[in-house]
Amino acid sequence: MVREPVKIQGTKEGLVIVVDEDVDIEVLKERIVDRIEKSLKFFEGATLNVRVKNSKFKDEELEDLKDFILKNYGVEIFIKKFQEKHIKNVTDDEIFNGLEEGITKFHRGTVRSGQVVKYYGNLVIIGDVNPGGLVQAAGNIVVTGTLRGIAHAGFTGNKEAFIVASSLKAMQLRIANIISRAPDKEEEVEYPEIAVVRKNKIIVRPLYHLSDLW
Protein backbone atom coordinates (compact mmCIF):
# COMPACT_ATOMS: atom_id res chain seq x y z
CA MET A 1 0.00 0.00 0.00
CA VAL A 2 1.33 3.43 -0.96
CA ARG A 3 1.75 5.72 2.01
CA GLU A 4 -0.28 8.91 1.77
CA PRO A 5 2.03 11.86 2.56
CA VAL A 6 -0.83 14.27 3.35
CA LYS A 7 -3.75 12.69 5.22
CA ILE A 8 -7.10 14.07 6.33
CA GLN A 9 -8.02 12.74 9.76
CA GLY A 10 -10.65 13.38 12.38
CA THR A 11 -9.90 13.93 16.05
CA LYS A 12 -11.68 15.54 18.99
CA GLU A 13 -10.01 18.73 17.83
CA GLY A 14 -11.97 18.47 14.62
CA LEU A 15 -10.57 18.19 11.12
CA VAL A 16 -6.80 17.72 11.06
CA ILE A 17 -4.43 17.56 8.11
CA VAL A 18 -1.50 15.33 8.97
CA VAL A 19 1.67 15.98 6.99
CA ASP A 20 4.26 13.23 6.64
CA GLU A 21 7.98 13.72 6.31
CA ASP A 22 9.53 15.02 3.08
CA VAL A 23 6.37 16.68 1.80
CA ASP A 24 6.97 19.71 -0.37
CA ILE A 25 5.29 22.93 0.78
CA GLU A 26 3.55 23.30 -2.60
CA VAL A 27 2.06 19.80 -2.31
CA LEU A 28 0.74 20.67 1.14
CA LYS A 29 -0.73 23.90 -0.20
CA GLU A 30 -2.45 22.11 -3.09
CA ARG A 31 -4.03 19.52 -0.79
CA ILE A 32 -5.33 22.12 1.65
CA VAL A 33 -6.78 24.24 -1.16
CA ASP A 34 -8.38 21.16 -2.75
CA ARG A 35 -10.00 20.16 0.54
CA ILE A 36 -11.34 23.64 1.23
CA GLU A 37 -12.71 24.17 -2.28
CA LYS A 38 -14.64 20.89 -2.08
CA SER A 39 -16.43 22.04 1.09
CA LEU A 40 -16.48 25.83 1.03
CA LYS A 41 -19.59 26.18 3.22
CA PHE A 42 -18.18 23.83 5.82
CA PHE A 43 -14.92 25.75 6.12
CA GLU A 44 -16.54 29.21 6.19
CA GLY A 45 -15.33 30.93 9.35
CA ALA A 46 -13.67 27.74 10.57
CA THR A 47 -10.18 26.91 11.72
CA LEU A 48 -8.01 24.09 10.43
CA ASN A 49 -5.33 22.22 12.32
CA VAL A 50 -2.24 21.16 10.37
CA ARG A 51 0.09 18.75 12.16
CA VAL A 52 3.58 18.40 10.70
CA LYS A 53 6.51 16.23 11.60
CA ASN A 54 8.60 17.81 8.88
CA SER A 55 11.30 20.05 10.31
CA LYS A 56 12.56 21.19 6.90
CA PHE A 57 9.69 23.67 6.47
CA LYS A 58 10.93 27.19 6.98
CA ASP A 59 8.96 29.47 9.27
CA GLU A 60 8.39 31.95 6.45
CA GLU A 61 7.01 29.17 4.22
CA LEU A 62 4.45 28.21 6.83
CA GLU A 63 3.53 31.84 7.48
CA ASP A 64 3.07 32.43 3.74
CA LEU A 65 0.83 29.36 3.58
CA LYS A 66 -1.29 30.54 6.51
CA ASP A 67 -1.59 34.04 5.03
CA PHE A 68 -2.56 32.69 1.60
CA ILE A 69 -5.34 30.45 2.96
CA LEU A 70 -6.69 33.14 5.28
CA LYS A 71 -6.67 35.82 2.58
CA ASN A 72 -8.23 33.70 -0.17
CA TYR A 73 -10.58 31.44 1.80
CA GLY A 74 -11.09 33.07 5.19
CA VAL A 75 -9.86 29.93 6.96
CA GLU A 76 -7.44 30.27 9.84
CA ILE A 77 -4.75 27.61 10.08
CA PHE A 78 -2.92 26.47 13.18
CA ILE A 79 0.32 24.62 12.50
CA LYS A 80 2.20 22.56 15.07
CA LYS A 81 4.40 19.50 15.32
CA PHE A 82 2.95 16.19 16.43
CA GLN A 83 3.74 12.61 17.31
CA GLU A 84 1.77 10.28 15.09
CA LYS A 85 0.83 7.89 17.90
CA HIS A 86 -1.23 10.65 19.50
CA ILE A 87 -3.56 11.00 16.53
CA LYS A 88 -6.40 8.54 16.19
CA ASN A 89 -7.40 7.69 12.65
CA VAL A 90 -11.16 7.61 12.12
CA THR A 91 -13.53 7.61 9.20
CA ASP A 92 -15.15 10.72 7.77
CA ASP A 93 -18.50 9.67 9.27
CA GLU A 94 -16.92 9.68 12.74
CA ILE A 95 -15.12 12.94 12.24
CA PHE A 96 -16.37 14.55 15.44
CA ASN A 97 -17.18 12.80 18.69
CA GLY A 98 -16.15 15.41 21.24
CA LEU A 99 -19.36 16.58 22.86
CA GLU A 100 -17.97 17.72 26.19
CA GLU A 101 -15.28 19.72 24.45
CA GLY A 102 -14.03 20.25 20.92
CA ILE A 103 -14.13 22.74 18.11
CA THR A 104 -17.07 25.11 18.12
CA LYS A 105 -18.34 27.50 15.48
CA PHE A 106 -20.10 30.71 16.50
CA HIS A 107 -22.56 31.95 13.89
CA ARG A 108 -23.49 35.56 14.53
CA GLY A 109 -26.89 36.66 13.31
CA THR A 110 -30.27 35.22 12.38
CA VAL A 111 -30.48 32.06 10.27
CA ARG A 112 -33.17 32.96 7.76
CA SER A 113 -35.60 30.83 5.74
CA GLY A 114 -33.74 28.78 3.15
CA GLN A 115 -30.37 29.31 4.85
CA VAL A 116 -28.29 26.33 6.00
CA VAL A 117 -25.56 26.52 8.63
CA LYS A 118 -23.59 23.28 8.95
CA TYR A 119 -20.51 22.47 11.00
CA TYR A 120 -18.48 19.38 11.89
CA GLY A 121 -18.27 20.30 15.55
CA ASN A 122 -20.41 22.11 18.11
CA LEU A 123 -22.49 24.98 16.74
CA VAL A 124 -23.61 28.11 18.59
CA ILE A 125 -26.12 30.42 16.89
CA ILE A 126 -25.95 33.90 18.38
CA GLY A 127 -29.40 34.93 17.26
CA ASP A 128 -32.58 33.23 16.03
CA VAL A 129 -33.29 30.39 13.61
CA ASN A 130 -36.32 31.38 11.56
CA PRO A 131 -38.90 28.95 10.09
CA GLY A 132 -37.33 27.33 7.04
CA GLY A 133 -33.81 27.80 8.40
CA LEU A 134 -31.66 24.72 8.98
CA VAL A 135 -28.78 24.33 11.44
CA GLN A 136 -26.72 21.13 11.50
CA ALA A 137 -23.85 20.09 13.75
CA ALA A 138 -21.86 16.92 14.25
CA GLY A 139 -21.87 17.89 17.91
CA ASN A 140 -24.23 19.97 20.03
CA ILE A 141 -26.35 22.94 18.94
CA VAL A 142 -27.01 25.98 21.12
CA VAL A 143 -29.31 28.80 19.97
CA THR A 144 -29.17 31.93 22.10
CA GLY A 145 -32.43 33.22 20.66
CA THR A 146 -35.58 31.53 19.35
CA LEU A 147 -35.34 28.27 17.42
CA ARG A 148 -38.26 28.09 14.97
CA GLY A 149 -36.60 26.25 12.10
CA ILE A 150 -34.97 22.84 11.92
CA ALA A 151 -32.06 21.77 14.12
CA HIS A 152 -30.07 18.58 13.53
CA ALA A 153 -27.46 17.76 16.16
CA GLY A 154 -25.11 14.77 16.02
CA PHE A 155 -25.75 14.39 12.30
CA THR A 156 -22.84 11.94 11.94
CA GLY A 157 -24.76 9.52 14.15
CA ASN A 158 -24.01 10.64 17.71
CA LYS A 159 -27.10 10.20 19.88
CA GLU A 160 -25.35 11.82 22.85
CA ALA A 161 -25.62 15.24 21.21
CA PHE A 162 -28.15 17.79 22.46
CA ILE A 163 -30.00 20.90 21.31
CA VAL A 164 -30.49 23.94 23.54
CA ALA A 165 -32.45 27.11 22.79
CA SER A 166 -33.56 30.08 24.83
CA SER A 167 -36.97 29.63 23.21
CA LEU A 168 -37.61 26.24 21.63
CA LYS A 169 -40.36 26.38 18.99
CA ALA A 170 -38.70 24.25 16.33
CA MET A 171 -40.48 22.98 13.23
CA GLN A 172 -38.40 19.84 13.60
CA LEU A 173 -35.71 18.45 15.88
CA ARG A 174 -33.21 15.81 14.82
CA ILE A 175 -30.53 14.11 16.86
CA ALA A 176 -28.50 11.52 14.94
CA ASN A 177 -31.13 9.58 12.95
CA ILE A 178 -34.01 10.34 15.32
CA ILE A 179 -36.59 12.89 14.22
CA SER A 180 -39.17 14.74 16.29
CA ARG A 181 -40.68 18.18 16.68
CA ALA A 182 -40.84 20.53 19.59
CA PRO A 183 -43.94 19.70 21.64
CA ASP A 184 -46.95 21.98 21.45
CA LYS A 185 -47.24 24.06 24.60
CA GLU A 186 -50.50 25.20 26.10
CA GLU A 187 -48.82 28.42 27.15
CA GLU A 188 -45.59 30.21 26.36
CA VAL A 189 -42.62 29.27 28.48
CA GLU A 190 -40.06 31.82 29.55
CA TYR A 191 -37.09 29.58 30.16
CA PRO A 192 -34.52 27.82 27.95
CA GLU A 193 -35.06 24.18 27.06
CA ILE A 194 -32.89 21.25 26.06
CA ALA A 195 -33.63 18.36 23.69
CA VAL A 196 -31.87 15.03 24.21
CA VAL A 197 -32.32 11.39 23.23
CA ARG A 198 -33.66 9.03 25.87
CA LYS A 199 -34.84 5.49 25.09
CA ASN A 200 -34.40 6.19 21.40
CA LYS A 201 -36.78 9.17 21.50
CA ILE A 202 -36.16 12.91 21.59
CA ILE A 203 -37.45 14.53 24.76
CA VAL A 204 -37.52 18.22 25.67
CA ARG A 205 -36.97 19.42 29.21
CA PRO A 206 -36.39 22.78 30.95
CA LEU A 207 -32.69 23.54 31.04
CA TYR A 208 -32.80 23.89 34.81
CA HIS A 209 -33.82 20.20 35.06
CA LEU A 210 -30.44 18.94 33.89
CA SER A 211 -30.05 16.82 37.01
CA ASP A 212 -33.00 14.74 35.79
CA LEU A 213 -31.22 13.98 32.53
CA TRP A 214 -27.68 13.14 33.62
Swiss-Prot record:
SUPFAM superfamilies: Cell-division inhibitor MinC, C-terminal domain. Keywords: Cell cycle, Cell division, Septation. InterPro entries: CAP/MinC_C, MinC, MinC_C_sf, MinC_N, Septum_form_inhib_MinC_C. It comes from the Bacteria. GO terms for biological process: cell morphogenesis; division septum assembly; regulation of cell division; regulation of cell septum assembly. Interacts with MinD and FtsZ. PANTHER family: SEPTUM SITE-DETERMINING PROTEIN MINC. Cell division inhibitor that blocks the formation of polar Z ring septums. Rapidly oscillates between the poles of the cell to destabilize FtsZ filaments that have formed before they mature into polar Z rings. Prevents FtsZ polymerization. Belongs to the MinC family. This is Probable septum site-determining protein MinC. The gene is minC.
